[in-house]
Amino acid sequence: MSANSFDARSTLQVGDESYEIFRLDKVEGSARLPYSLKVLLENLLRTEDGANITADHIRALGGWDSQAQPSQEIQFTPARVIMQDFTGVPCVVDLATMREAVKELGGDPAKINPLAPAELVIDHSVIADKFGTNDAFKQNVELEYGRNKERYQFLRWGQTAFDEFKVVPPGTGIVHQVNIEHLARTVMVRGGQAYPDTLVGTDSHTTMVNGLGVLGWGVGGIEAEAAMLGQPVSMLIPRVVGFKLTGELKPGTTATDLVLTITEMLRGHGVVGKFVEFYGEGVAATSLANRATIGNMSPEFGSTAAIFPIDDETLNYLRLTGRSEQQVALVESYAKEQGLWLDPAAEPDFSEKLELDLSTVVPSIAGPKRPQDRIVLAEAAQQFAKDVLNYVEAPAAQPAASASPVDEASAESFPASDAPAYGSQENGAGAPQHADGTGAAVPSNPVTVTAPDGTSYEIDHGAVTVAAITSCTNTSNPYVMVAAALVAKKAVEKGLTRKPWVKTTLAPGSKVVTDYFEKSGLTPYLDKVGFNLVGYGCTTCIGNSGPLPEEVSKAVNDHDLAVTSVLSGNRNFEGRINPDVKMNYLASPPLVVAYALAGSMKVDITKDALGTDQDGNPVYLKDIWPSEAEVNDVVANAIGEDMFSKSYSDVFAGDAQWQALPIPTGNTFEWDPESTYVRKPPYFEGMEMEPAPVEDIAGARVLAKLGDSVTTDHISPAGAIKADTPAGKYLTEHGVERRDFNSYGSRRGNHEVMIRGTFANIRLRNQIAPGTEGGYTRDFTKDDAPVSFIYDASRNYIEQGIPLVVLAGKEYGSGSSRDWAAKGTALLGVKAVIAESYERIHRSNLIGMGVLPLQFPEGQSAATLGLTGEETFSFSGVTELNNGTTPRTVKVTTDTGVEFDAVVRIDTPGEADYYRNGGIMQYVLRSLIRK
């Protein structure tokens, strides 16, 4: 119930329905705010409680100074939570564990349910193993179920056990496309109230829904769990960059060309930690599908969100996708009543401004390794000839460009798609990077390959070995998808097909795509050029491209060929799309088809022939490129509201395989002691209703002493599990074959694997174990403190009751927002971290897991204080938290005589409550039982 200090509670009549709303015009200054901040303002008005959210917070947002640096913290309560399976499974594991804890404390386990609607779409597990055949989809689904049966059984139980929790089963679509086509409300209705639809998601590209006027972004699992359980998300009131659009796109240019141009502009400007908001006359000329493509790539821009206001185009899309007339009428009435309707002539207050004339956008691709490295299509072959030198001619001699934190966060998000998290000093500005390679000859090393059917062909540097129509970024956009299918049709009619070394895949983000291909008669043409359906899921975009054909892979590796991929995704970092492929290019779906026909990045597809027709005449791209009228004609005739309504009528039901999964019944989950994917974590063991008093920390040893810019991927890697590591040994001991290890990302529901993977990144350098790389430390419980695995040493410390501490440099915990970086740290027995500075989300996650984040005094560090990591540490003054106050500093002393006052980085009253309770889950659990 809102405190309603501003007398903002009112009613809105729409047809026969009446809704309670909170009027923005009751707050002075609200009219000049950007759309995105108006949405936040309504959120504060509606959730004002006088404690976490006060009238002062509301006034601060109403009186927002567009030129000030962000400093005011506010508590944002998202309307709902969206998840995918990699990042969502651990959230559901925690909910299931909370139910058991409630039962053990004498409460009703059925009380533990998401308080905000939570929806999980299974899309991250399908791998494009099989391709180029009519049964590729069926085979890939069977392989997916084989690999993921334990996880799927668990999610199937969750689907039946929890209220307000829904699961979209595998083989249905990609989370963000399902979100815009079906789940998003634009205006929410709950308990008789109408308010803007907002969300947080456990995936970096959650921002796709910004195209629909819905404010939301990616967060880590701990924040998502908190939001599900009704806790607000802490954030700073951001700067807002106004991005003015004028004019309209020229025929022949696509949404992909537009978004790559915007990526280049925004990365050049620097928008980390900021909202980007589109305005101006050109917004009306930007289709909703194009807006969604732009919103999707907000993480690649570096921004928190990239949002479009509500207008007629929004309403048309809601109608097209089968939303009810009452819902569409509500969205229109609410937006107009609250000043959220787009006025193309208005210029709200913005912190910074950029402008793009849409008519200047030209056909483009981006690569070979970063999404902001845009290349004009007409110059792509020339630029490839220069860039390939970095991969062929003595790569060691090439000076490595230092990765920006935006690139690092994005690159590390494979395959789990964790949300990015950046340090406070970073704005993400940076120019595109390309080799100049002037005057150098294009390297060539042709290799003959023999296919299983006995035919042979030559491949060389630059061969396109993967051509993937993939990713919700583009498969949600009917215009580029139909254009791709028409390129395929015209190519087939001219007698062209893909080159034999190209692995071609089609993996749309929803079944609507294949429905309109079928209805328009275009499916057979896509099949004929090799773009058979391989799955409905992320596939190649997150690196699940599956292996190249054996003979191609062998030739590439034996001869060290710099081969390429072309994909319609959103990220293209080196080695992430396929381990055999060094250079990756982002392109629109029709260009993906064109490059599959050309077979090499050396081909200038704007001038060179892609092949020859039946009569031996050269066929050029212009001969098979569809006109805008042809594309629009198919879209108009093949896509209608009935298609979306039918496709989503039973979206949560799943296929026969899903429905046949054996699932336990009841309010609590029956944990399988043999499972290596899903296990009950120990967060609540021994927990009582009253939290034990906070204690000072004495006799602590250093587990790791780390440098600057240690990312969450260093702390908790998401990628492959090596056999000779504690996690690999654990899986081997539990009967898992090495080929079935899967990734850390897929095993986040098993704390035993994840603890062993904490600080286990092969690139980690622990300064107390010099000369080592990876998860090593020195074990001071043993004579001479030998080098040991971090996990093994932590068990010895825990056995002897010795608390642990981590020492770190600047920007500790940057990269992606990965909850296991904090969970793993806590489960290793770490009680405190002392760093020079923190990334904001990781700092709050540490508190959420009961770990104390401390900061060295200004200008001091482990080095200036002479700390080696061999000391024993004690911390006094922490107990002040028992008196209801948070100490500004605590006294740190070592057995070597070093003393200093460390700054306590518990920054809000809510965080202090979490820490006193031993963590956020314990706090929420006690609160729910008391209710």
UniProtKB/Swiss-Prot annotation:
Cited Gene3D superfamilies: 6.10.190.10, Aconitase, domain 3, Aconitase, domain 4
Cofactor field: [4Fe-4S] cluster
Pathways per UniProt: Carbohydrate metabolism; tricarboxylic acid cycle; isocitrate from oxaloacetate: step 2/2
Keyword set, alphabetical order: 4Fe-4S, Iron, Iron-sulfur, Lyase, Metal-binding, RNA-binding, Tricarboxylic acid cycle
EC number(s) reported in the record: 4.2.1.3
Family: Belongs to the aconitase/IPM isomerase family.
Name of the featured protein: Aconitate hydratase A
Organism: Streptomyces viridochromogenes (strain DSM 40736 / JCM 4977 / BCRC 1201 / Tue 494)
Gene for this chain: acnA
